[in-house]
Amino acid sequence: MIRQLIFISVFAATAAMAALAQNVTGTVTCGGAGVSGVAVSDGINVVTTDKQGRYALQTDKANGYVFISIPRGYTVDMADGFNPQFWQKLSDAKVETAEVHNFKLTYSPADDYVMIIGADSHLARRIGDRKTYKNGYIASLKYEKEKAAESQLPTYSMILGDLTWDNFWYANKYTLRNFMDDQRKMHYPVPLFPVIGNHDNDPAVPHSANTDFLAAKLWRDVVCPNYYSYNPGKVHYVVLDNIVYQNDTLPAGKKARKGVWGQRNYNAAVTEQQINWLRQDLALVDKQMPVVVCSHIPTFRINRNFSTFGSLQNYKELASCFDGFKNVHFVSGHTHVNFNAHPSEYPHIMEHNIAAICASWWITGKLTGTDMCTDGSPAGYSRWTVRGDSIEWK
């Protein structure tokens, strides 16, 4: 009897510890039925749902969210018509507090669609940028959506970083929160999967060992996780944050704009935490499936001799994550020019650097009436037509 009581006590204690360890749980369902095999993550660990659509995650809650990788054949609710609800904020920072977060999917079997890829909107409440953005980019998105609908194709979009301009967050009172509000007011017409850029980090955060994490807090609070994945059709999309924000102390005698603490400088790299998450994410992906890697700074660039070189500090480590994959596309912004690169070292990888929505920070349009990037290419975006695992771009 004593042995039985000891066994029961030990079992109960073990079960309690297990429940405490798995402090974020929930379900992923469609029409009330569980969806199995859906990747769920806190940005550090990746788990998948069981046959009943249930998941259990052990998390330190450091990132403050939980998200799913939207699976093929499904979509999620779009808040305000454009904001995909694939993530949820955690409600309590205490690790010992258990939380339940459920996700609902809608069946959407389309493997064919249009993806509009823009970059560098740089909205900052200056020189009429928001009006030009609405009359130009938003109007173009509406046109693209209508044209795609004629072929019964859904339309998605992404903006590859620098949605805002950190130098004017406080001087012009225009932060990421204002950007998201503007998209609501302008009726952004298609789902938007955003990417963080260097100008989307909070310049008021002082330089420290934790600057990069703290400077991205507003992004994580009001936009979405700064790295995640999703699966429209037969293509796997990965969004990465390749900005390691430093914001070093200003040199003596140099002054910054209102609210800006430091130099707003950064390193171009993907953190080890993201690399570890990415390897877990890709382990769930068929290597025959095309992968599109979305980030702000190009991983590969072209020099004056038209030779391709790696531009991230740890580009080799990042590229190694895609060993064995056959068809990998990197898409990026940041440069305000337009180019494609084929790194000879990685024949399965192609870089697409997309010209800026704002052209040359909205200045050429203001001065000349023509929005033109620094290489002479027009302001705009790239339109990708995806049919199954076939991708065409313009």
Q: Where are each of the predicted segments found?
A:
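Active-site glycine-centered loops adjacent to acidic/histidine catalytic or metal-binding residues
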Residues: 120, 161-162, 197-198, 296, ...
